[in-house]
Design a protein with these regions (language model features):
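Non-heme Fe(II)-dependent double-stranded beta-helix
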Residues: 1-28, 35-128, 134-137, 174
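Active-site region of the double-stranded beta-helix
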Residues: 106-107, 132, 149-158, 166
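Double-stranded beta-helix
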Residues: 154-195
Length: 195
C-alpha cells in the first residue's frame, strides 16, 4: 500500500544539499532559514494531513480569554507521527534527517518528538523562550525544524530567532510565560544580539 503520492515520497527521499556557508551560518548563530526545502505541492498535502490530525487530537476546549499567556500562544499537539502514517513519512523523512544531521555536524539524528503548533486568531504572542526547558536532554546537539504550512508574512507573526542567543543561559529554566518574555527580552537587549 502506498502511503504518499509518488512525487511527494520521492521528494522526501531526495537530499537537500547544504553549502559550507549555510552550515557555518548555523554553527555560528544556531538557526538558519532554508528556502524551498519542501515544494508547495508537498506543503499543501501535509497541511491537509496535519490539520486533520490536530482537529482530531486537540484537547483544548477553553475560550482564549480563559487561558494564560502560554495557552493563548498556540494550540499544540504532540507526536502526530505516532497517529498518522502520512505525517510519520514527513517527520522521519531522509530529507529532514539529512538536513538536521548536516547542520549539527553529526553522523545521524533521532527524533525526540514532533509538534504541530497552530496559532489562533487573536491568540497573542509567543513569548521569548528557550526550548531546552522542555527537553530533558543533556546534549546541546538538538535542533528544531519549523515548517510553516502556509505563507507567513510578518503581520502573522512568524518565528523569530536571536542570532547567537544559544550562548545565553538566562531563561533556560523558565517555562513559556510572561516572565520568560520579560527576562529573555531583557537579556537580549543587554547582549545586543540581533533578532
Amino acid at each position: 500500500m502506498t502511503i504518499l503520492p509518488d512525487t511527494i515520497a520521492l521528494e522526501l527521499n531526495q537530499p537537500y544539499p547544504l553549502t559550507p556557508e549555510q552550515v557555518d551560518f548555523y554553527q555560528r548563530n544556531r538557526y538558519i532559514k532554508l528556502k524551498h526545502v519542501l515544494s508547495t505541492n508537498t506543503l499543501d498535502y501535509f497541511n491537509d494531513a496535519i490539520t486533520r490530525c490536530v482537529n482530531t487530537l486537540n484537547t483544548e476546549t477553553r475560550e482564549l480569554t480563559e487561558r494564560d499567556t502560554y495557552g493563548k500562544a498556540f494550540i499544540q499537539t504532540f507526536n502526530l507521527w505516532l497517529q498518522n502514517p502520512q505525517v510519520k513519512a514527513l517527520v522521519l523523512s531522509k530529507r529532514l534527517a539529512q538536513i538536521a544531521s548536516d547542520l549539527m555536524q553529526t553522523q545521524g539524528v533521532r527524533i525526540y518528538h514532533d509538534q504541530a503548533l497552530f496559532k489562533e486568531s487573536g491568540g497573542g504572542i509567543t513569548p521569548w523562550h528557550d526550548d531546552q526547558y522542555y527537553w530533558p536532554l543533556q546534549s546541546d546537539k538538538t535542533i528544531t525544524a519549523w515548517i510553516p504550512l502556509q505563507a507567513t508574512p510578518l503581520e502573522m507573526g512568524p518565528l523569530e530567532f536571536s542570532a547567537g542567543s544559544h550562548q545565553i543561559v538566562t531563561g533556560r529554566d523558565l517555562e513559556i510565560s510572561d516572565n520568560s518574555e520579560i527576562e529573555i527580552q531583557k537579556q537580549l537587549r543587554v547582549t545586543n544580539f540581533p533578532h
